[in-house]
From Swiss-Prot:
Gene name tied to this protein: hscA
InterPro entries: ATPase_NBD, Heat_shock_70_CS, HscA_NBD, HSP70_C_sf, HSP70_peptide-bd_sf, Hsp_70_fam, ISC_FeS_clus_asmbl_HscA
UniProt KW keywords: ATP-binding, Chaperone, Nucleotide-binding
One example of a Gene Ontology biological process annotation: iron-sulfur cluster assembly
Name of this chain's protein: Chaperone protein HscA homolog
Origin species: Aeromonas hydrophila subsp. hydrophila (strain ATCC 7966 / DSM 30187 / BCRC 13018 / CCUG 14551 / JCM 1027 / KCTC 2358 / NCIMB 9240 / NCTC 8049)
Amino acid sequence: MALLQIAEPGQSAAPHQHKRAVGIDLGTTNSLVAAVRSGQADTLCDEQGRDLLPSVVHYQADTIRVGVDAKREAALDPHNTIVSAKRMMGKALADIDTRQQPYQFVAADNGMPQLQTRQGLVNPVQVSAEILKKLAERGAAALGGDLDGVVITVPAYFDDAQRQGTKDAARLAGLHVLRLLNEPTAAAIAYGLDSGQEGVIAVYDLGGGTFDISILRLHRGVFEVMATGGDSALGGDDFDHLLADWLKEQAGLTGELDARLQRELLDVAAAVKHGLTDADAVPCTFAGWQGSVTRSQFDELIQPLVKRTLLACRRALRDAGLEQEEVLEVVMVGGSTRVPLVRELVGEFFQRPPLTSIDPDKVVAIGAAIQADILVGNKPDAEMLLLDVIPLSLGLETMGGLAEKVIPRNTTIPVARAQEFTTFKDGQTAMAIHVVQGERELVADCRSLARFTLTGIPPMVAGAAHIRVTFQVDADGLLSVSAMEKSSGVQAEIQVKPSYGLGEDDILNMLSASIANAQQDMDARMLAEQQVEADRVVESLNAALAADGEALLSPAERAELDAAIAHLLTMRSTGTTNQIKEAIEAADAASGEFAARRMDASIRKVLTGQNVNKV
């Protein structure tokens, strides 16, 4: 649906005024901007007719160059020429492989990577902002005025920190972000709406630095992402590095190359890769070595990486509950899908030739432009619904270190879910909320996202307060968590922005661990639940004994109940799940008469001095 804008009376825009909106594919290697003009979405070109903008920024003493001009400086001035900044978005310096990069890295106080340039320290958000500025200038020039809004695409596996970094870059560039859109979903818009295709579609997106696989179901204009997978650190750049290492070996070079020679080597490798798209062999010259690279040699180098992408495809299909033969179409996205081996192996895996009718470099930007045109209000009658999913379950910690899932993984977003919790102790006036992410049963095995405290809870007996905790994930995949005590209305809220991003390996490890430890985790959860119940029973009995034990129990009865409590505490520390359960039942039985006497005493106290006829 269109995003509605409210204005003061007499200041609203003309009802049918066409607004300027663009879609931006902010890529690792190249970026594009597209717009809908005369009802047709297409990419926008610069003065030289080029639509691809290299995602490269060169910092000179007094100016900043972006794109082709910056890329020319990469080999000459690598320390001040930043490429593939998207790989570093939302990550800590410790999480970045700096070995093959020519930059001088400096860690900020918050762990964010900074790069030393002639203009001082810059971070990936600032670098990305320069690219977005350049694309926005192109869009404004093509559309004849300032932009009213943009849709920016991100890999489906970008986590909260990476998405927030992208939004921050857009804000630095002075752009109004209508929505962050998953790249595979954007491709589905470009293909699905144009062809009217209904059914299951696999979107295979292999760009310069990231790989995403999305399993989509298209039905009556509704896009549902059934499952996602991929690798946020795998793409055509890795093909270049493998080929560069091979060329270095052929040239007889050993040890680390200086920054300029390393950049030249990567440029040669990229040129050879592009040449092998159409040729069986490509001549090559580097550092005095002359030879050629055949397609079969290149295929042998990259085949393990391509097969890695197919493993992710298999996992995504399993998550969606589908087999390969149920996929009707396979959409190829990203310049790296031009590699013949990629198309061949993907076709074999899905048992059908992949779709390549739309330029794989342009398809994401075109889909983003279509979505931007709708969100800005140029197509108010459009009936298109996008349903993305979250990759890992979101929940919070409960007593005993248990992880209570509030939003399960692969839930479509935007989404809001709420659960009610209560206090554990009498008179409890605060509750600590610990937000976690993951599939395991115990908090210790999940990823901690954020903590906050709800204070001002009215003192009540344990279990009387009702605290409603709401998890809300917006259309950009960002999470906010709020907690409210229902009787008083006191509340607290936090927006979850994880300090650092999760890599694909981390996500896969978390999923694999949840499967491998499923039975062990469930056993641990059942044990923890019984331990929590034992604590509750002991707390309740001790409070009751302190209040009425001396008045209502004989010494022998008190000794018997004390023994039952002591046995329960022993079992709680050393016993099995069943032994703790039996000890709880024994304590309940031992305290049954005491509970009945307390009830009688309470009733007598209430009725004292009352007229029987009025009761």
